[in-house]
Amino acid sequence: FGSMARFVPALPLIGGGQTRFQPIFAGDVAECVLKAVDAPTKYAGRTFELGGPSTYSFKELMEFILTTIRRKRLLVPVPFFAAYPLGMVGEILGALPFVQPFLTRDQVTLLKSDNVVGETDEDLGATADFGIDLETVEAITPTYLARYRKGGQFSEDPELIS
């Protein structure tokens, strides 16, 4: 959506932006995998749902992206029934060479369900079982969203200069 925000005056909030997410940093997932490989008897035969330390609504994530890339865009609530035709148009355009679909029907379907860690039990584990300190969206995301700001990653930002 950071890329899309560079070119369009408004961004869609599919389903009103209420879908919940629990994003996790890929480096944290890798750390969990390494711990599982290093201690197979502790983790073998179990399934783990991995999620980050916080949950966000789709709307909250969109607002965070826009704030991070310093762009003001209108966020337009789009009900699911209206998003499906948009997804079909996106798929048709995506069939053209060198065109990335802006939205697909599969993405709309995925946005109908929250993407968060559920309840755990002895067979179903969670990120906490690995005992690692998780990175936050606020700590990681600005470093790779910087390229979508006006001036790109080379515009001055005291928060990103270390």
Predicted feature descriptions by range:
Residues 2-15:
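A short C-terminal helix-loop "cap" of Rossmann-like NAD(P)-dependent dehydrogenase/epimerase domains
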Residues 6, 38, 70, 142-146:
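Residues at helix-coil transition
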Residues 15-38, 45-49:
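Substrate-positioning beta->alpha
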Residues 20-27, 48-68, 77-88, 133-135:
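Substrate-binding strand-loop-helix patch
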Residues 30-37, 65, 137, 144:
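Hydrophobic "lid"/C-terminal helical patch
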Residues 36-51, 71-76, 99-103, 122, ...:
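Core catalytic loop region at the nicotinamide-binding pocket of NAD(P)H-dependent oxidoreductases
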Residues 81-162:
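A hydrophobic C-terminal alpha-helical subdomain
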